[in-house]
A protein has these predicted regions:
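Patatin-like phospholipase
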Residues: 1-68, 100-113, 158, 162-171
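A short alpha-helix-loop-beta-strand transition element characteristic
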Residues: 69-83
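Active-site gating loop/helix substructures
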Residues: 81-182
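Mg2+-dependent phosphoryl-transfer enzymes with acidic/Ser/Thr/Gly-rich catalytic loops
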Residues: 183-191
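ATP/nucleoside-binding phosphotransfer catalytic cores, i.e., glycine-rich phosphate-binding loops
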Residues: 194
Length: 197
């Protein structure tokens, strides 16, 4: 059984969404929502950015999909023996926050929404009243966190094309962007090349 091999998973950004489908053992759900339903519902695009100030249709992704269109099995997730951690970036501290939630489905949605909130093109999301953005800003591959937590053998699943190499870019953030969150601005300045917009 998978739980005998992988006692804990960590999901970041879109990986947090995919990880939830894995944790509920809904085989094919992540592929169906990311490929098949994208073609049908076109939930990514400039029309959403112009209409809702969000490049992704979060209402569709985090309400309609899990509740109606592609029902998510919360109970299977809550009952799974493995631990599941979702990573966000805390706008106040500019550091990663690591969340485990296996009781409250609304909080699960708040966390995965925050983990998937890309900077610049998605609004800030809130978890427990704290402003959050995409976990990939500061910990896109949380391998060190897993090692720190005592997991010596780790498997990393990346969504990169073969041969991908990160470019070093010196990108300046305009002064009006996230001006209320100086620590977030610092984090974005350090790691902007890791964000996939």
């Amino acid at each position: 059984a998978a739980s005998d091999v992988y006692k804990r998973q960590i999901g970041v950004s879109a990986g947090a969404c995919n990880g939830l489908s894995y944790m509920s053992r809904q085989r094919g759900r992540a592929k169906y929502s990311n490929i098949d339903l994208l073609e049908k519902y076109h939930y990514i695009g400039l029309k959403h950015l112009l209409k809702k100030r969000n490049i992704l249709d979060f209402d569709l992704l985090f309400t309609e999909f899990p509740e109606h269109i592609l029902p998510y099995d919360y109970q299977a997730y809550f009952d799974s023996p493995e631990r599941y951690v979702m990573v966000t970036t805390n706008c106040l501290t500019g550091e990663a926050d690591y969340f485990e939630e296996k009781k409250d489905k609304n909080r699960v949605i708040d966390i995965v929404r925050a983990s998937s909130s890309l900077p610049f093109v998605c609004p800030i999301a809130y978890v427990d009243g704290i402003p959050m953005l995409d976990g990939g800003i500061v910990d896109s591959i949380p391998l060190q966190r897993a090692i720190h937590d005592g997991y010596r053998n780790n498997v990393v699943v990346l969504t990169r094309n073969h041969g991908y190499r990160k470019e070093n870019k010196d990108i300046r953030i305009p002064p009006f962007v996230y001006r209320k969150y100086p620590k977030m601005r610092e984090a974005l300045s350090r790691r902007l090349s890791l964000i996939h917009i």
